[in-house]
Design a protein with these regions (language model features):
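Helix-turn-helix DNA-binding segment
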Residues: 291-294
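Alpha-helical DNA-recognition elements
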Residues: 297-300
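Structured, helix-rich domain cores that form ligand/interaction pockets
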Residues: 1-282, 303-357
């Protein structure tokens, strides 16, 4: 029950029909803190075996009736990646990167959490060092790791190593998790049949509040699911393009010599997002029929790696690579560039070269 170990044990109790009471134990694990008292590094699939060993030992010390690690079901998981801007050669500060992220394509069904009280405005406002978006089934959280450590663990000896780190995190609650893995449970080494019920029957009972099918731990923590969760949710907000100043972004679009309607649509979105200081803000001003045109342009800009969010001129930075794509490219040492990707990269390089002349 020592939180400093990276594991907490919470007793749960709920009254159901006919005065029956269901009791259980909720275990909250911070993998890196559990393994090596590290509050910065993100856990990976290879850490699972060590986590299982420590959990089973701690559970056995508390009670022999506690389930083994593989017999438990996941209720929530927080896939994340740490991106060190300096290490990847990304030429902006963490504060600047968070500002760009806040201008991203925030879906209307996500609500931004207001975490700080502003004395001047006399109201709660969003944290300047993070973007915290939530729905009933998930949370997407982007934050500067160094600033967050200053709030939670200001005296942590390794805090300095997080000075240039941006963490991208997706917190998946039970319903989102089950929807992701319901058809691949059998791939788990822990999977067992659930009272003979078919998957679809279990899903219906879950929605009716009668049944919670087991979510195997190893399936969700596998790279297959982990990276799918991160890429799908993070790219939705960041988009897939690099950041440029408005003039350079416009020049890249024009360098393709698209038909006039397509080029006009893409540049129109670049200018609208720049003027509104964000994709979501620009989209909020549009009528329903205009949103269709706007979304089409977003996808077209993705294909040429131009982000709709542009770099403020006062920063004196011409190009900032896409955060998530740069991270995955660096991890894949044998990454093979497709002909189309090479074509897109050459367009960007040519325009930037002309800007330097």
């Amino acid at each position: 029950i020592n939180e400093d170990k990276g594991i907490r044990w919470l007793l749960l109790s709920r009254k159901v029909k006919n005065n029956y009471v269901i009791r259980g134990v909720l275990v909250v694990i911070n993998p890196e803190s559990l393994i090596e008292n590290n509050y910065i590094r993100a856990a990976e699939e290879d850490d699972l075996k060590k986590i299982e060993e420590i959990y089973n030992r701690e559970a056995g010390n508390i009670s022999k009736v506690f389930l083994k690690f593989g017999e438990c079901s996941l209720n929530r998981v927080d896939p994340c990646v740490n991106i060190d801007l300096k290490e990847l050669g990304i030429p902006c500060t963490p504060e600047q990167m968070i500002k760009l992220i806040k201008r991203g394509n925030i879906p209307r069904y996500y609500k931004e959490r207001k975490e700080c009280y502003d004395e001047k405005q006399r109201r709660m406002v969003a944290d300047k060092n993070s973007l915290y978006l939530e729905t009933k089934s998930s949370v997407i959280n982007f934050y500067w790791k160094y600033a967050k450590q200053g709030e939670k663990h200001p005296n942590y000896s390794k805090r300095e190593s997080s000075r240039n780190v941006i963490r991208l995190e997706v917190q998946c609650k039970y319903l989102k998790l089950y929807a992701l893995i319901k058809n691949i449970n059998e791939e788990s080494k822990y999977d067992e049949s659930d009272e003979g019920l078919l998957r679809d029957e279990m899903y219906l009972k879950m929605y009716e509040g009668m049944y919670n099918p087991v979510i195997p731990i190893d399936i969700v923590l596998s790279a297959k699911i982990y990276e799918t969760i991160i890429c799908k949710n993070i790219y939705k907000i960041l988009r897939q393009g690099d950041y440029f100043t408005l003039d350079i972004a416009r020049n890249i679009v024009e360098s393709y010599c698209f038909r006039s309607g397509k080029e006009e649509r893409m540049i129109e979105v670049l200018e609208s997002v720049n003027e509104s200081h964000g994709i979501a803000k620009a989209k909020s001003k549009l009528r329903k029929d205009e949103i269709v045109r706007f979304n089409k342009a977003l996808k077209e800009l993705d294909t040429i790696w131009v982000n709709p969010v542009t770099i403020p001129r006062r920063w004196n930075i011409k190009h900032i690579p896409n955060l998530l794509r740069t991270y995955y490219d660096a991890r894949c040492e044998e990454y093979l560039v497709t002909k189309y990707e090479e074509y897109v990269m050459n367009h960007i390089a040519e325009v930037l070269k002309r800007e330097r002349q």
